[in-house]
């Protein structure tokens, strides 16, 4: 039996994986600054693009906190970052510049989480979308650094139909450290 697709996926070409729909986003370059991020962000507000943009914003945050906060605010919409949110990101990313890249295809602990270029992100749709309240969407991101895909929740702004970040703390949870940094490897 084919998986039940969220309404926004109707008509989208996708690839099934173990009964779960996978949407792939391809990025040629990870933004180096806010201006590059904004150009990339114009390409779409679809949920799978928001997932890829989150990883780009986290990478940017690690390089330049101000640009990273501004990028995150673009993704969070009407719920901007608080100082607590910025501190949470700083704590989770400290010493882990590899973390945002770990979700792209080809990134493994063995290669220091250096993904192949172009950057490909596979977004797994919720296998049980009927359990999600209207206006919200649960998706999952897979990394070679964890045993199971990590969830993130998006929220749709009813007046515009745009999707925004809502809950993404699992994406920032610890993963296996790169093999080069692992004294037990």
Please tell me what each predicted stretch does.
Residues 2-3:
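Intrinsically disordered, low-complexity, charge-dense segments enriched in Lys/Arg
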Residues 86-147:
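Surface-exposed, charged secondary-structure patches
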Residues 12, 16-105:
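Core segments of small alpha/beta cavity-forming domains
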Residues 142, 147-184:
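Short beta-strand edge/turn micro-motifs at domain boundaries
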């Amino acid at each position: 039996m084919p998986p039940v697709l969220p309404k926004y996926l109707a008509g989208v070409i996708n690839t099934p994986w173990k009964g779960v729909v996978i949407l792939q986003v391809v990025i040629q370059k990870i933004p180096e600054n806010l201006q590059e991020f904004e150009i990339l962000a114009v390409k779409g507000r679809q949920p799978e693009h928001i997932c890829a943009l989150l990883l780009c914003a986290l990478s940017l945050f690690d390089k330049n906190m101000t640009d990273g906060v501004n990028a995150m605010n673009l993704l969070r919409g009407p719920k901007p970052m608080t100082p607590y949110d910025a501190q949470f990101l700083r704590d989770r990313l400290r010493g882990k510049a590899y973390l945002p890249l770990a979700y792209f295809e080809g990134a493994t602990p063995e290669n220091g989480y250096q993904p192949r270029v172009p950057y490909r992100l596979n977004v797994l749709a919720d296998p049980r979308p009927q359990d999600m309240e209207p206006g919200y969407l649960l998706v999952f991101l897979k990394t070679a650094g964890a045993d199971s895909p990590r969830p993130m929740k998006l929220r749709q702004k009813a007046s515009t139909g745009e999707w925004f970040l809502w809950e993404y703390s699992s994406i920032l949870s610890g993963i296996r450290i790169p093999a080069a940094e692992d004294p037990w490897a």
